[in-house]
Design a protein with these regions (language model features):
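Conserved pre-motif I regulatory segment
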Residues: 2-40
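Conserved helicase motor core of P-loop NTPases
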Residues: 3-6, 29-30, 37, 154-160, ...
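Conserved SAM-binding loop
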Residues: 18, 72, 267
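Short, conserved phosphate/pyrophosphate- and ester-handling motifs at nucleotide-, phospho-/glycolipid
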Residues: 22, 76, 271, 455
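ASCE P-loop NTPase helicase motor core
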Residues: 26-27, 31, 36-231
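Catalytic phosphate/metal-binding cores of nucleic-acid and nucleotide-processing enzymes, i.e., regions
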Residues: 39, 77, 336-339, 362, ...
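Short, solvent-exposed amphipathic alpha-helical segments in soluble enzyme
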Residues: 88, 282-286, 478-482
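C-terminal accessory regions
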Residues: 351-353, 357-360, 365-504
Length: 504
């Protein structure tokens, strides 16, 4: 298919005339797709409200219609869910597609870079601003540098190429000053031929949105290097952005939970300490929760966990073997193969994944810590259900997860139970397989930090920036504020917003 044919087919999928910037981006995309260079890559940078989502959706629908193979990826489960809803086809986490488990070693699994068996495939990665390359998470996954591994994976395939989609005004990955996956210079360093385009103009249908009007103003402070005073927010004339006095917050949150649900409402704040305060207040005063943890509570995983998914895979395999022994017919074997696929479990539970408590079945105090056995449902993984042991101590701690000292304390207490195993190597192996040592570390998910919310979208978003003065103004704060604002799709509430930051 030539350039003009591909461009015409994508335009047909738009449903409305593209903006000049969208048309230019489309020109770049069709050139990228028809380039014979096997090492071509494209970056599509677009800010909130500029039509990036509608453009990528039209591209996906067109490529599927012309039978061009496409794989949709995103850095987190929530981001993959949003990408899937916006494009109309399944999307997966990057980790789930590019890594395979080498060996389960208890707390820290070991995942190697997978072989890329895809051919003639376009890998489209949304929310690429979140892709890190510093290796802060150690080497549990491949080289420890996600961007390195993603590029290596894609370009080891035959005639595969990569389209990175993201917003450079959002928070960059932790420890990095900018998002490496959205940098043309960074990608050229891999020997890739880079196509790039930017969408900056807010499309007409977005101009009536107070969320996008103010987010655009904040973004322009970044692009124009005009970070000299705290931004003033315009509320008047808009119905989708509101000041939220603290005295009205409890009632407003209750209304949001009633209107759009617990899973589509979020409070975004600046620290784990503030998130804890909000979570306790919401549970006690809005949801009337009296127990430490109850059915219906929303939780967030705060440390990667590999053990429980490995246990799930073992259970599924055992069930299938048991059924196969009962019935050996060809008809059943076909059914069994279908069951294997339909029960595909996530490779691991990632820091930031959200879960709903369906049942609290057992509580126990052991080793100086508090545990519970829960039935959990994961809304970002097709409502996958899992029974697991959860560590309750992290629910209200100010630290992001168990501290190093607490982890050491838990390890040594559990080790005492395995003193009958003489060889240290065997003893370590047994501890790493212990369900309490591998208990899920969780926090309540009604209020989260902005890094935890990044990649997701919620109908109702409440933003708490805490106390701010001009002296505390940094580029990081402006990126934080922009990222927090753009999590909202319907209503944005600014909690206890100071008069000095309101446009008069």
């Amino acid at each position: 298919m030539n350039i003009e044919e591909l461009k015409y087919k994508i335009l047909q999928q738009f449903g409305f005339p593209p903006t000049p910037e969208q048309a230019q981006a489309l020109d770049v995309f069709v050139q990228f797709m028809t380039d014979s260079n096997p090492h071509a890559v494209m970056i599509l940078r677009g800010s909130a409200g500029t039509g990036k989502t509608s453009l990528s959706g039209a591209i996906v629908r067109t490529l599927r219609a012309v039978r061009q193979k496409v794989m949709l990826l995103a850095p987190t489960g929530r981001a993959a869910k949003v990408f899937s809803l916006n494009s109309g086809m399944p999307a997966y986490t990057i980790h789930r597609r590019i890594y395979r488990e080498k060996a389960f070693a208890g707390v820290d699994g070991q995942f190697n870079l997978n072989d890329n068996l895809y051919t003639d495939t376009l890998f489209m990665v949304d929310e690429a601003s979140m892709i890190a390359n510093l290796g802060l998470g150690g080497t549990t996954f491949g080289s420890g540098c996600l961007l390195d591994d993603l590029i290596h994976f894609v370009y080891q395939g035959r005639n595969d190429r990569l389209l990175l989609i993201g917003d450079k005004a959002q928070l960059p990955p932790v420890g990095e000053e900018e998002s490496p996956a959205l940098s043309a210079a960074m990608l050229q360093g891999y020997g890739l031929s880079v196509y790039e385009c930017d969408l900056n103009e807010v499309v007409r249908q977005s101009q009536q949105s107070g969320i996008l009007f103010n987010a655009t103003r904040i973004r322009q402070m970044i692009t124009h290097d005009d970070i000299t005073q705290l931004p003033k927010i315009r509320f008047s004339g808009f119905s989708d952005i509101r000041e939220m006095p603290g005295a009205e917050l409890i009632e407003a949150l209750g209304d949001s939970y009633h209107q759009v649900g617990l899973d589509d409402t979020i409070v975004v704040t600046r620290s784990n300490k503030r998130a804890n305060i909000f979570n306790q207040g919401i549970r006690n005063m809005v949801l009337d929760r009296e127990e430490e943890l109850e059915s219906g509570d929303m939780l967030m995983i705060v440390k990667n966990n590999y053990y429980w998914m490995e246990e799930e895979r073992k259970k599924i395999k055992e069930r299938q073997l048991s059924e196969e022994r009962k019935v050996k017919s060809e008809k059943f074997n076909t059914l069994a193969n279908h069951i294997v696929q339909s029960n595909e479990v996530p490779a691991f539970l990632a820091n930031g994944d959200r879960a709903k408590v369906m049942k609290v079945s057992r509580r126990i105090d052991l080793y100086g810590f508090h545990f519970a056995t829960l039935l959990l449902k994961f809304p970002d993984y097709d409502n996958y259900e899992l029974e697991a042991t959860v560590l309750l101590d992290t629910l209200t701690s100010e630290a992001p997860a168990l501290t190093h000292d607490q982890q050491e304390q838990l390890f040594h207490k559990i080790e005492e139970d395995y003193q009958d195993i003489p060889l240290k190597a065997d003893r370590m192996k047994a501890i790493r397989q212990d369900p309490y040592f591998n208990a899920l570390q969780v926090k309540f998910a009604y209020a989260v930090t902005c890094h935890k919310a990044q990649g997701g979208q919620w109908s109702h978003v409440y933003v708490d920036q805490g106390y701010m003065t001009d002296d505390m103004l940094t580029p990081d704060y402006i990126h934080w504020l922009y990222t927090a604002f753009t999590r909202a799709t319907e209503m944005l509430y600014l909690v206890n917003w100071p008069n000095t930051q309101i446009e008069g």
